[in-house]
């Protein structure tokens, strides 16, 4: 086979990037080279690659126009380095002697000659169209880093895994991440927990979005994934780039990007309980030069549930424009719109008997009123600018504006229920409404430099956010009857209610600012040292208005220049394995609790120690992680023991601890077989509890299973059956229990739930290169179990019975 130009291009369109710093030598692609090439326009990156490797690079300018490289840092052969550099670009490469040829995958630029090495660009940051369960790098720490380089545990849900396991919302994601559980209602707004603590640190494209119960105004938990191509979950304290929050971890949602090539995809689904969903996603260049690109994706879902009366409608639209202002500057702007209308979606779950035994409810039981509703709407606008300052330095500016509205009527049925005659339950209801908005801005620079002869990386930045929330509470019709006790919980039909007059309005504002920095130094060849710190300013104000008597109750809390550090060591044992140790902190403001003198309680403080071992194999397509961790949370609010009970006074005297072990493997283990498996062992305890010393030494997070195993594997059959895929997975966990958190807690009655094992499966078939048909089956053996366990009074939920989802995916 000989070199030949495609008919589409003439010889004069070929560009030649040659080695300038190193002499040309035969078989240069086999020699190890220490590369340092930042993310930048691909033409510039290929020039730097040629200079650093001594390899000639041939390409057509039209083939790489509008494309950007990924970051390449480390020691690789020229072949390995070029593969990593071309990740996400959609181009092929080939070597012949000391020359590398670049072409579009369609082959319309060059007919490649016979070569000594032929390869395809491997995994990068973007996981779309990689068909991989892992990623080459993540961005949850501001810069692109492989999982092996990060001294904390990070789990990634890639685009392919989201498709294979039929995941459509962020709340669905929580059920797949090892060691993560959720608490909350069945309307999709469940709060995730990891390692015994709440995860209330959220990011979008690496930009902090205060969204948790302790620091945020809006909620992201119910978000549709139509806007995002992957989800990154970091476990442990994450205060360095985030600011205030709990020590459970952080979640980074990464938006889909626009391609310069026209692509159209659709997803059509139909499943159990009248579950129907449609997606349409279109993208492509908007000018001939492909410097302006756009993408528009939309989804609509309507469904019922396995319990009586529950149903919902959800709609989402995502749009983004990307513009190459010049070879060094990329601008992005867009929006995400989402709304959900939920009806009778069981916001408070099921109760148990007061002696801790289970009530024999049918799985279809719904104790919510038929008039219950929960309607939410969210609109977000975003802008991002990335500028390559030079070969080593890059600046990023990102800003978001979000509006979030809620209109709801909730009812709850629970109480101290007698196991003899089923009496003792009550029914309660109220209306709610919220109007919230939030601004977030982040500006940072990151780059590489030499320090004492060693290559180093620094990140310096600042971010700020402003949020306002106006939350109203409403009475309902037959309000006095709402607290009537129910004579028999097993023969009870919830009444209908209607929202009436407003009785309370709470206005909250939250301002956060932060300065942060991180330095990573390669002290000597196998060892990287990472040090970082963040100074945070936090200002929370609340004004609660009693609409009945006009009385205002105001409170505020400020934290000034609160500093949290981060320290980490990463030691490369060999090209495949690295070991690490890290220490991270975070703080959590304690809102609406005061000391006896009226001053705000000092923030809670969380610190996490972690020691681990990470592996990367098969050119980064398989990643492993083993970690032991300990998180201590101090300064929890406790009622002041030196003051009378009539004084609503607190001291920061509580202390809890969580510790354990995690193991995870994700990626391709053999041709056609992608899998993920994660095991978590986690215990927690009260270390200090002045209000109830009986609790000390007992379990703190009782609803977190001590043992949890989550697995999933998908196999693309080989040979003549290669159009078929089969998948299977499981969720296996030990028992949990719920108990009261007030009163005589140490002697409280437990609501215990045993462990369970749930198995799922998938079968897929490629009709042709454009169409795939599949069916997903959840809970194959139709196991009856509780997916969430509350106290004896409420908040226990059955898990989904066996159900199926049929899917047709098209790609053009």
Give a label for each model feature.
Residues 731-743, 764-812:
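C-terminal beta-signal and adjacent terminal beta-strands/loops
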Residues 322-324, 436, 455-467, 506-633, ...:
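Structural signature of Gram-negative outer-membrane beta-barrels, strongest in the C-terminal barrel
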Residues 525-526, 651-741, 781, 811:
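Gram-negative outer-membrane beta-barrel transporters
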Residues 51, 56-58, 71-73, 113-261, ...:
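Acidic, small-polar-rich N-terminal luminal/periplasmic segments of exported/outer-membrane proteins
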Residues 210-211, 227-229, 240-319, 325-329, ...:
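Outer-membrane beta-barrel translocator/receptor signature
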């Amino acid at each position: 086979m000989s070199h030949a130009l495609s008919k589409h291009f003439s010889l004069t369109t070929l560009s030649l990037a040659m080695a300038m710093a190193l002499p040309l030598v035969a078989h240069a692609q086999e020699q190890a080279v220490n590369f340092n090439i930042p993310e930048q326009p691909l033409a510039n990156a290929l020039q730097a690659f040629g200079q650093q490797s001594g390899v000639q690079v041939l390409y057509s300018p039209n083939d790489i126009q509008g494309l950007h490289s990924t970051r390449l840092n480390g020691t690789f052969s020229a072949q390995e380095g070029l593969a990593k550099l071309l990740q996400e670009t959609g181009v092929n490469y080939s070597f012949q002697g000391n020359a590398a040829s670049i072409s579009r995958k369609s082959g319309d630029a060059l007919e490649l000659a016979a070569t000594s090495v032929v390869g395809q660009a491997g995994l990068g940051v973007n996981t779309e169209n990689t068909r991989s369960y892992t990623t080459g790098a993540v961005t949850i720490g501001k810069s692109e880093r492989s999982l092996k380089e990060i001294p904390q545990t990070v789990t990634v849900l890639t685009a392919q895994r989201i498709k294979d396991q039929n995941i459509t919302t962020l709340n669905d994601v929580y059920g797949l991440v090892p060691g993560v559980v959720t608490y909350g209602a069945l309307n999709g707004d469940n709060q995730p927990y990891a390692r015994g603590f709440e995860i209330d640190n959220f990011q979008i494209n690496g930009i902090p979005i205060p969204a948790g119960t302790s620091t945020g105004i809006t909620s992201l938990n119910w978000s549709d994934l139509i806007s995002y191509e992957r989800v990154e979950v970091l476990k442990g304290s994450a205060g360095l780039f985030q600011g205030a929050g709990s020590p459970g971890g952080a979640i980074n949602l990464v938006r889909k990007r626009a391609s310069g090539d026209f692509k159209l995809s659709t997803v059509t689904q139909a499943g159990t309980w009248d579950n129907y969903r449609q997606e349409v996603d279109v993208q492509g260049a908007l000018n001939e030069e492909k410097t302006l690109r756009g993408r528009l994706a939309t989804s609509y879902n309507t469904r019922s549930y396995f319990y009586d009366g529950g149903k919902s409608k959800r709609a989402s639209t995502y749009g983004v424009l990307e513009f190459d202002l010049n070879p060094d500057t990329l601008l992005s702007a867009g929006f995400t719109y989402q709304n959900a209308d939920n009806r009778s979606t069981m916001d408070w779950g099921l109760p148990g008997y007061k002696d801790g035994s289970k009530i024999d409810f049918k799985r279809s039981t719904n104790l919510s009123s038929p008039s219950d509703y929960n309607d939410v709407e969210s609109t977000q606008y975003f802008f991002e600018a990335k500028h390559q300052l030079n070969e080593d330095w890059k600046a990023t500016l990102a800003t978001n504006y979000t509006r979030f509205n809620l209109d709801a009527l909730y009812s709850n049925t629970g109480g101290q229920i007698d196991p003899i005659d089923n009496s003792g339950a009550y029914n309660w209801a109220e209306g709610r409404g919220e109007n919230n908005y939030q601004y977030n801005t982040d500006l940072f620079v990151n780059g590489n430099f030499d320090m004492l002869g060693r290559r180093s990386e620094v990140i310096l930045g600042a971010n700020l956010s402003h949020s306002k929330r106006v939350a109203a509470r409403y009475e309902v019709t037959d309000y006095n009857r709402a607290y009537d006790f129910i004579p028999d919980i097993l023969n009870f039909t919830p009444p209908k209610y209607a929202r009436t007059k407003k009785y309370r309005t709470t206005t909250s504002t939250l301002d956060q600012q932060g300065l942060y920095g991180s330095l990573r130094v390669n002290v000597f060849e196998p060892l990287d040292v990472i040090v970082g710190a963040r100074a945070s300013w936090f200002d929370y104000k609340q004004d609660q208005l009693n609409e009945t008597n006009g009385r205002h109750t105001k409170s505020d809390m400020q934290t000034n220049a609160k500093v949290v550090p981060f320290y980490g060591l990463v030691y490369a044992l060999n090209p495949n394995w690295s070991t690490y140790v890290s220490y991270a902190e975070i703080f959590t403001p304690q809102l609406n609790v005061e000391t006896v003198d009226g001053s705000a309680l000092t923030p809670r403080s969380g610190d996490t120690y972690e020691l681990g071992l990470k592996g990367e194999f098969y050119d980064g397509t398989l990643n492993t992680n083993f970690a032991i961790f300990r998180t201590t949370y101090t300064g929890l609010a406790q009622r002041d023991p030196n003051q009378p009970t009539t004084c609503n006074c607190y001291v920061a005297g509580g202390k809890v601890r969580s510790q354990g072990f995690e193991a995870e493997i994700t990626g391709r283990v053999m041709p056609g077989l992608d899998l993920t498996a994660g095991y978590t062992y986690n215990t927690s305890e009260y270390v200090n509890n002045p209000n109830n010393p009986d609790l000390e030494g007992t379990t703190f997070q009782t609803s977190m299973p001590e043992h949890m195993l989550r697995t999933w594997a998908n196999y693309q059959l080989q040979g003549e059956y290669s159009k078929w895929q089969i998948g299977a997975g499981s969720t296996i966990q030990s028992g949990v229990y719920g108990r009261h958190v007030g009163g005589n807690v140490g002697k409280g009655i437990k609501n215990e739930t045993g462990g369970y094992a749930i198995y799922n499966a998938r079968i897929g078939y490629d009709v042709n290169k454009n169409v795939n048909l599949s069916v997903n089956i959840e809970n194959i053996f139709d196991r009856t179990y509780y997916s969430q366990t509350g106290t004896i009074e409420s908040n226990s939920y059955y898990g989904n019975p066996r159900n199926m989802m049929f899917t047709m995916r098209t790609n053009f």
